[in-house]
Structures are given as C-alpha cells and as structure tokens.
Amino acid sequence: MTCGSYCGGRAFSCISACGPRPGRCCITAAPYRGISCYRGLTGGFGSHSVCGGFRAGSCGRSFGYRSGGVCGPSPPCITTVSVNESLLTPLNLEIDPNAQCVKQEEKEQIKSLNSRFAAFIDKVRFLEQQNKLLETKLQFYQNRECCQSNLEPLFEGYIETLRREAECVEADSGRLASELNHVQEVLEGYKKKYEEEVSLRATAENEFVALKKDVDCAYLRKSDLEANVEALIQEIDFLRRLYEEEIRVLQSHISDTSVVVKLDNSRDLNMDCIIAEIKAQYDDIVTRSRAEAESWYRSKCEEMKATVIRHGETLRRTKEEINELNRMIQRLTAEVENAKCQNSKLEAAVAQSEQQGEAALSDARCKLAELEGALQKAKQDMACLIREYQEVMNSKLGLDIEIATYRRLLEGEEQRLCEGVGSVNVCVSSSRGGVVCGDLCASTTAPVVSTRVSSVPSNSNVVVGTTNACAPSARVGVCGGSCKRC
C-alpha cells in the first residue's frame, strides 16, 4: 500500500507528502523550528501525518537540506548537506513521459484510499452508534422482560383463588344435593303417608256408604214397620168398631126378645185386653226398635262424624305438610338452581380466566420469544458489527503500523542525514518544472535513502526530493525512470 502522495488538491492520508505543482515556485527555505512547510502548496496531513516535513531550498550557491522531526518539534540544530556546485549544472537527461500518468494514478489511488479510510471511520462511528442503540434496546428488552415476568404469578394466584372458590361451590353443591336427596326422601315418605291416608279415607268413605246403606235399609224397615203398625192399628180400630157394632146389634136383638138367658161361658173372650195387649206389645216392639235404630243411627253418625273429623284433620295436616314440603322443595330447588347457576358462572369465570391466563401466557411467551429472537438478532448484528469493527480496527492497526513504520523510516532518515551517514544518490535533470515522485513501501528491511536533485536554469526552481523506500530487496528507486538504479 502506497502512503506517500503528491497532493494537487486537498486530500488526506495516513502520511501525506506535499508535492509542488508544475510550473510554480513551490519550495523555499523556511527556518521554522518544529514544523517546516512548503509555501504555496495545497494539501495537508492525515491522522498520523508527519508533523515536520522536509525543507529544502537554494540560497545563493549553496544547497540546504534539512529535515524536521516527526510528530513533535524538530531538533534545535540540523546539519546542512553541502552539494557540489558542479552538480547543479543542467544535464540533458531523459524524463519518462509516463511519470505524470503514474503520479496521477497514485494520486487517485491515494484519494480512493483516503475516501475508503474516511468511509471506514464513518462506518466505525455508525457501528458504535448502532452498538449503543442495540445495547439500549437490549437493556430495555431485559427490563421489559423482567416487568412481564411478574404477570405469571399474579395470574396463577388469581386462578388458584378461582379454583378454591369453585371447590367451595362444588362442596356446597354436594351438600345441597345431599339435602335435596334427604328432602326428596322425606317427601316420598309423606307422599306414601298421604296415599295411605287417602286410601284409608276411601275405605272410611266406603264404610260410611255401606253404613249409610244399612241405615237406609233400617230406616226403610222402620218405615215399613211403622206402616204396618198404622195398618194394624187401623185394622184393630176397624175390628173394634165392627165388634162393637155386632155387640150393639146383638144387644138390640136380645133386648127385643126380653129373654134373659144366663149362660155360664167360661170361654169369655176379652178382645179389648187382647187388643190392648197386642197393641202394647207392638208399641213396645216399635218403641224398642225405634230406640235401637235411633241409637244405632246416632252412634253410627257420631262415629262417622268423628271419623270424618279425624280424617279431615289428618287430611288438613297432611295438606299443610304437603304445602310446607312443596314450599321447602321450591325453596331448595331455587337454591339448587341458584347454586348451579353460580357454579356454572364460576366455572365459566374459571374457564375464561384460564383462557385469559393461557392467552396472556401465550402472548407473553410469544413476546418473550420475539424478544429473545430480537435479542439473538441484536446479538448477531452486534457480533457482525463487532466483526466489522474488528476488521476496521485491524485495517486501522495496519495503517497505524504503516504510519509508525514510515515515521521510523523518516526518523532514521533524518538521523542519518543529521549524522551524515547513509547512501545518497543524487540525480540531476535539466527539465523545466520537474517533479520528484517517490514510491514508499513498507518492509522489515533497513531503509535506504535515495535523493534526486532536479536542476533547471536560473529562472527555475531547485527541487530536492527525498524518498524512503523499503522494497523486499532493500532497494530504493526514484519514480520516473530518471535514475538507472530504478
């Protein structure tokens, strides 16, 4: 990589060398300490450019060559190199016509390298900004992940509470179901009792109907007997009147005959006594039958009334108990329905909460996976950026090594120039407005100094170019082909 350049414009590199423009007086002696410059030139130095450039000039018949320090003030005393005046006479030397093209190519190459270096620097800055941005995002995602991780125990606690409530509701529903079964059993017992009472009432009603039939039959018999008694009484009355009439008729006949016949009739029939006795017997029978029938009817009626009252009271109590049981059944049914509704609501709430919890957990897992993917991608991007940064730093390190190598070469050259040690090759050309071109190469071999002096007529400038080169063969050549050693 070539790091020396002749700057016709404003270009920068790791080590910028300033070259004169053709046709202009561009080199004068400037006895500054620490920094030497070429007046009238345009150009500059890079990040690690040479702080003290070469200074050369002509003063009268002597030629001075001085070298400034590198990245610091130059030594206070630099010995001048005296050049033989005869060497300044113009020589007819051929100049390579391709030197300008080579210089232009080198200039463009240095510009492109400077542009690449600036692009690398911008890229490094951009990558640093991206690295900071990714670190901020990573910290934000980590904090966000920590914040989201607190939701899972909350959902678990809420779900556990709902499960406990569901278990309590299930226990209450079991208890209510057992109570409902007990009440249904009691209801079945009361239903059986009610059916038994209904059957007993039906039996009592049947007995009452049978007794009523018997009473009716007895009443009919009583009526028949009363009718018979009336008929017998009428018959007795008829017979009595008949006998009385017969007796009256007989007495009238007897009175007409006026014969008194006294007969001792022991067979005297006392009909009145007989009739009275029969009547008394019938009256006694009727009275006794009536009394017995009335007493039996009254007893049966009282018994039936007591039975009806008893069964009515039992039926009323049974109806009240049935109504009470119906109300209790309705109340328990309402409670069971309410418990079932509450249980279904709680189950729906538990299912909804579980679904919401699962949805939240799945969403959290998805977000966590997205964040992990983003984090992994950020890590990969960071790794790529770090790798590119390492590549850029390696390039920068190589450039720094080259700069340090060139600095050491320049320091060694200045030291040799100050001590007067080292091989100096002076080539003189008589071209007008000649430009010195130097190719600089980095190598591990010892530097060799090659100096070319281009001499022009008295109205032209004197340019002294010093080139440090480290070729693999430890040789130094001056561009342009003006020296046979190149």
Curated annotation (Swiss-Prot):
Further remark, if any?
There are two types of hair/microfibrillar keratin, I (acidic) and II (neutral to basic).
- An example Pfam family from this entry, by short name, is Filament
Q: Where is this cross-link: Glycyl lysine isopeptide (Lys-Gly) (interchain with G-Cter in SUMO1)?
A: 212
The record's PANTHER family line, in alphabetical order, gives: GATA-TYPE DOMAIN-CONTAINING PROTEIN (PTHR45616), KERATIN, TYPE II CUTICULAR HB6 (PTHR45616:SF7)
What is this protein's name?
A: Keratin, type II cuticular Hb6
Q: List the disulfide bonds.
A: none
Involvement in disease: Monilethrix: A disorder clinically characterized by alopecia and follicular papules. Affected hairs have uniform elliptical nodes of normal thickness and intermittent constrictions, internodes at which the hair easily breaks. Usually only the scalp is involved, but in severe forms, the secondary sexual hair, eyebrows, eyelashes, and nails may also be affected.
Residues forming the IF rod domain are 106-417
> What does UniProt give as GO cellular component?
cytosol; extracellular space; keratin filament
Which intervals of the chain are annotated as region Linker 12? 253-269
Q: Which organism is it from?
A: Homo sapiens (Human)
Q: Name one GO molecular function term.
A: structural constituent of skin epidermis
The segments labelled Coil 1B in the record are: 152-252
Q: Where is this region: Tail?
A: 414-486
Start and end residues of each stretch annotated as Head:
1-106
Matching Gene3D superfamilies, A to Z?
1.20.5.170, Single helix bin (1.20.5.500), Vasodilator-stimulated phosphoprotein (1.20.5.1160)
